[in-house]
């Protein structure tokens, strides 16, 4: 019977002519596995990306559209000795919980056997220095074998299965030397017992398995902790929504069945499943994890809502603008996934070292055995020493040194409101010693404020707001928002470059340029009140009013600038805005170095000048308007609105009103880089010390297992320090 495989549900478009799929891969435990999988998949023609994420054992694949069947990737992984299937968050979590429980059972069996075998070994050890009869010693050895052999057969399954799959595929992984070491120790012990020898190694073999299982169990649980942020984000995703299928009829349908333009009902206590705009109702919503706004947002007609937001109080009708994988939540999840799977410079270095290290280890173990035999040692002693070399030199710590830090640091940055858009952004940001800020939309809030709204009569301001709804100009949008306008004036006409007008109760009303409204005489007053203001006029018959609109500084901008100065970071403003506006912002923030009226070319020239002086420049600017200067800087960062997240071009982006993510990201990056270097030195130092000691024969396989597991756990624990909070911004 011919069986076909359809993976179309799991394949998505990653770019023009490029397809993407995520596969879950079983049996990935170390950097050697990662390197082998990536090499094997990259060798397939037309594959443009093959990247393994060790924290969730997922491989991301991209290839030229129309050239490959995704089933070929699964077949190739099977040839390499790994079982693979399309990645789904829920099923991956279930599989990981099942594996964690299995590891715990194996650990329990191994630990129980270890305690009993150790108790049986005590009489043997004491008998070797007293007068124990050979028959008594053999009896204790056979009892130990009766406990250790079945226990090892069960508890060693995680290693034996992985090694068998690798050998069946005519390859090796780091479970192969571990399995060889355990089997050799048990086999030698049985042979020694049969020949009535004084020494057997059942205690060492089963304790070796116990140490290895402790290390693997802790390693898996630490990986789950590092992925906690991504898991929390996935938990925000609602799978169904109440869709209106008639004027007063709703149906609970999967999110995949919802399209833009549909209307859904959002009840109190529910998570929003779509992006859209409220068309009816009033409520408070919590969207802190989506947009960075820590306070509840009042949602009413015209308010945008996003998938993952929690509806707190009222009932809302929402017109859908995006659903499923097109939502802001999905875009944030993709950016976070990219950050977790990214390859930094240090990670590429560690991968290369791990890949070269494995064959060297195997060769070293073989040479050690032969060297000891040539030197006159027995095969027994030589093999024991070789087993110790195989185990102690496993490059697990080296393989975990960088990805664990990057995963933890990415999660810490996400909690600070920062998303990574580049693989080596953390390392480059940590090196930054000079920050250039754009003013408009960066140091200032992206939304405009009507500064003199309180001075305008309420009825006039409401009328101006309703008229502003008929204009597409951002200043008009600010007036409409400030006035709380919801119903536009019927019959309003917009005149390009001038403003908008309409007739109300027989009187003509106008909103726009002062000349359009006949209010030129009032402009001087507004300019004197605030030289930075954008001027908009409103007229109703003979009544004339001036509204002055400006962008306010971000609420914490002054504190953030002070914090950056305290970190010995140079700061300046480069803005294309008018000199009075830039000068006022620089004065308010105590930034002595600023330039106004600069062009994109001027910004690039200034960045290049600083780079020639040896500065590492962080450019913080609008992701769309400052694209050239963002690309020219050593590293770049953009404040970006929810609507424009998918268009982000900077190395890092942040959502929300505060500027604090800039300082928090620098702190996190510097700490992460410090921990990466620390971990590399820990891993390298461990191997430099461990290999000669193991070759010398001083270390038993038992001590080797404890040292190898301990080095990996030490690296993981050190990496978790990247979660700690950044320095307080005051």
Curated annotation (Swiss-Prot):
Keywords, ordered alphabetically: ATP-binding, Cell membrane, Magnesium, Membrane, Metal-binding, Nitrogen fixation, Nucleotide-binding, Phosphoprotein, Translocase, Transmembrane, Transmembrane helix
Residue ranges annotated as Extracellular topological domain: 124-138, 191-202, 376-382, 697-701
PANTHER family xrefs: P-TYPE CATION-TRANSPORTING ATPASE
Subcellular location: Cell membrane
InterPro entries listed in its UniProt record: ATPase_P-typ_cyto_dom_N (IPR023299), ATPase_P-typ_P_site (IPR018303), ATPase_P-typ_TM_dom_sf (IPR023298), ATPase_P-typ_transduc_dom_A_sf (IPR008250), HAD-like_sf (IPR036412), HAD_sf (IPR023214), Heavy-metal-associated_CS (IPR017969), HMA_dom (IPR006121)
Species lineage: Bacteria, Pseudomonadati, Pseudomonadota, Alphaproteobacteria, Hyphomicrobiales
Keyword Transmembrane helix: yes
Active site positions: 438
Organism: Bradyrhizobium diazoefficiens (strain JCM 10833 / BCRC 13528 / IAM 13628 / NBRC 14792 / USDA 110)
EC number, as in UniProt: 7.2.2.-
Gene3D superfamilies tied to this protein: 3.30.70.100, Calcium-transporting ATPase, cytoplasmic domain N, Calcium-transporting ATPase, cytoplasmic transduction domain A, HAD superfamily/HAD-like
Listed name of the protein: Nitrogen fixation protein FixI
Membership in a protein family: Belongs to the cation transport ATPase (P-type) (TC 3.A.3) family. Type IB subfamily.
Role description: FixI is a pump of a specific cation involved in symbiotic nitrogen fixation. The four proteins FixG, FixH, FixI, and FixS may participate in a membrane-bound complex coupling the FixI cation pump with a redox process catalyzed by FixG.
Entry's Gene Ontology BP terms: detoxification of copper ion; nitrogen fixation; transmembrane transport
Positions of the HMA domain: 19-85
Cytoplasmic compartment segments: 1-101, 163-168, 224-352, 401-676, 721-730
Regions crossing the membrane: 102-123, 139-162, 169-190, 203-223, 353-375, 383-400, 677-696, 702-720
Gene this chain is encoded by: fixI
PROSITE patterns per the UniProt record, alphabetical: ATPASE_E1_E2, HMA_1, HMA_2
Residues annotated for a metal cation binding in this entry: 30, 33
Pfam families, sorted: E1-E2_ATPase, HMA, Hydrolase
Catalytic class of the enzyme: translocase
One GO location term (cellular component): plasma membrane
Molecular function via GO: ATP binding; ATP hydrolysis activity; ATPase-coupled monoatomic cation transmembrane transporter activity; copper ion binding; P-type ion transporter activity
UniProt catalytic activity: ATP + H2O = ADP + phosphate + H(+)
Binding, Mg(2+): 622, 626
Bilayer topology: Multi-pass membrane protein
Domain of life: Bacteria
